[in-house]
A protein has these predicted regions:
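N-terminal and secondary-structure boundary signal
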Residues: 1-318, 322, 328-333, 337-343, ...
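Extended, alpha-helix-rich binding/interface surfaces that flank or overlap catalytic cores
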Residues: 352-353
């Protein structure tokens, strides 16, 4: 792309269908409109955030009306719309139904594409991985439109456009990738490689009703009133992260992207259209309890023990836990042991702080709890 990468910010206060459609058109206008990306006959894949089957008011999934508006714009430009993902929990059809998206699929005649077939895909030169097994179905289209939801994330601080593409990893392989990648910095490297491999042509962020606190599955809905759009998932994340009060160096995905020198990772490479960053910024946005600004750039034999003490770990609340066993099943290191009467124990000596358990818990019974050193640092205001 020649010149700065556009990121469009538009106010959208609710999910009134006509209002969402108009706001989306305004967001796409600085990008040349949907017609600049789509020619008649193009097959277009929508990749929303379909983490779990929760109703729209819970702000867990991309809202049905954002999917409707994007679909109508694509159809008006002559494209055929498909919708696909590999949910973290439950079947795609179940999540579409419980999230209210199935109604839009039926109304507009969208074609549903479950991500079922893992295939090795080469990562572009400059990645950490040579190839990654991703859903083969995601590579059968002329254009991918990434439709993330604005949410917090216990491991990655925020889940926006780049993180949403982790949904192209098929089902049960997700925990194994968490194990392979490990901490948030290495997970960020994996996410960047997936982003560069999948290469969505358009990214539209649903930030009308976002999620703050202990996201991405059990945080609190927060009215943000924002739609954002960009051809670059990375540039979109850079701008929106700043709006939420998270400096790029404190966001693992953005920090690693700057170190790699990826396009869209630096403010001077980006031009914001629509709302000014000052007008779009969100006051007092609540970040995950696991969030910390502590830098452990020390030798491993020193930083390891410090990092464990200054990290957060999952806590299973026995008053909420139903002992369904989902957390045990998704933990990549088998660190969780459930109690018969509710709740459970996490073996901190092997826990890798991926928070897959918290992400997948259908009851919201798991939350991050700070280690002893982190509690002190937070009390002192330095973490």
């Amino acid at each position: 792309m020649i010149g700065p990468i556009p990121v469009s910010l538009v106010r959208c206060l609710n999910y009134d269908p006509d209002g969402v459609r108009q706001s989306l058109r305004e967001a796409l206008d600085p990008l040349g409109g949907m017609g600049a990306l789509i020619s008649p006959g193009h097959k277009v894949l929508l990749k929303p955030n379909l983490l779990q089957g929760k109703p729209p008011e819970k702000a867990v999934t991309t809202h049905p009306e954002v999917i409707r508006a994007a679909s109508l714009e694509i159809m008006e430009a002559g494209g055929t719309v498909f919708i696909g993902d590999s949910p973290g929990s439950g079947s795609l059809s179940s999540v579409l139904s419980k999230s209210g998206i199935a109604g839009v699929v039926e109304d507009l005649g969208l074609k549903v594409v479950p991500f079922r077939t893992p295939v090795p895909v080469s990562v572009p030169v400059g990645g950490v991985y040579h190839s990654i097994e991703l859903a083969g179905e995601a590579f059968e289209f002329d254009l991918i439109v990434n439709l993330p939801k604005l949410k917090t994330h216990a491991q990655m601080v925020l889940t926006l456009a780049v993180k949403n593409l982790f949904g192209t990893v098929v089902g049960a392989a997700k925990p194994s990738w968490h194990l392979k990648a490990g901490d948030s910095d290495h997970m960020a490297e994996l996410l960047l490689d997936i982003y560069r491999t999948v290469a969505p042509g358009l990214n539209i962020l649903d930030g009308v009703l976002g999620m703050e606190g202990n996201g991405p599955g059990s945080g609190a809905p927060r009215e943000v009133g924002l739609l954002a759009a960009s051809p670059s998932a990375l540039a979109l994340d850079l701008v929106v992260s700043s709006l939420l009060g998270v400096d790029a160096k404190e966001n693992p995905v953005l920090r690693r992207s700057m170190e790699r020198g990826l396009p869209g990772s630096m403010p001077e490479q980006v031009k914001v259209f629509g709302l000014s960053p000052e007008d779009a910024s969100v006051d007092d946005f609540i970040l995950p309890a696991s969030y910390t600004r502590v830098d452990f750039s020390l030798p491993d034999f020193i930083s390891g023990p410090l990092k464990r003490s200054a990290s957060s770990y999952p806590f299973l609340d026995p008053s909420i836990c139903t002992t369904c066993g989902i957390c045990e099943g998704v933990c990549p290191v088998s660190a969780i042991s459930l109690f018969d009467d509710g709740g459970g124990d996490v073996d901190k000596s092997i826990c890798i702080n991926c928070f897959c358990c918290q992400e997948m818990c259908p009851e919201g019974a798991i939350r991050p709890v700070a280690g002893s050193l982190l509690k002190i640092l937070k009390r002192l205001g330095v973490a």
